[in-house]
Amino acid sequence: MAGVGVGPLQGMVRFGLLVLTVCAACARGLYFHIGETEKRCFIEEIPDETMVIGNYRTQMWDKQKEVFLPSTPGLGMHVEVKDPDGKVVLSRQYGSEGRFTFTSHTPGDHQICLHSNSTRMALFAGGKLRVHLDIQVGEHANNYPEIAAKDKLTELQLRARQLLDQVEQIQKEQDYQRYREERFRLTSESTNQRVLWWSIAQTVILILTGIWQMRHLKSFFEAKKLV
């Protein structure tokens, strides 16, 4: 009987680990410092047809108080997003704090870059700028209270909607993993094929070199009348 229960239990554990992995990968919260002309970029692995929401706010370094304070409204941030093919998905100027959204149409590494317009702002005065950035991917980007109010969903219906969105996100993650595995397989096959042809080329070169040396030695010995 114990052997019968191990399979389903392992399946549940694996599914739970996958859910935790997906949930951990769906939200990014961090802060970083940038200078006047510095651009900071991040790479985010995103499945296709997935919504991404980024929220940020900026703080400026006060030299007198030696503390970071909320930035003035005049200071802005430029956000640029590129897909795995290098195409610009989003390029827009925002304020000192804001929110940007985009939907991926190609699976893979998306580049998210931010830089300030401080080169035009005298108030920056060569100081530091702290940027708090929170990136939410997939179903974590949904505002469920707003959805519940708009669609007039009960608590049970809202929970069912959340579970369906989570399952959909897991399916997208699995599709993306299969896509990566397929790319890795093609790369491995291409590499193995190149190694094989290079080995064949080396063998042919070695054989031709040996034949040439034998003929050269034969000609040498014949010239010396040793054979």
UniProtKB/Swiss-Prot annotation:
The gene is Tmed4. It is a single-pass type I membrane protein. It comes from Mus musculus. It is found in: Endoplasmic reticulum membrane. Induction: By brefeldin A, oxidative stress and heat shock, but not by tunicamycin, hypersomotic stress or serum starvation. This is Transmembrane emp24 domain-containing protein 4. PANTHER family: TRANSMEMBRANE EMP24 DOMAIN-CONTAINING PROTEIN. Belongs to the EMP24/GP25L family. Keywords: Coiled coil, Endoplasmic reticulum, Glycoprotein, Membrane, Protein transport, Signal, Transmembrane, Transmembrane helix, Transport. Residues 1-29 form the signal peptide. Residues 213-227 are cytoplasmic. The chain crosses the membrane at residues 195-212. Glycans are attached at residue 117. GO terms for biological process: protein transport.
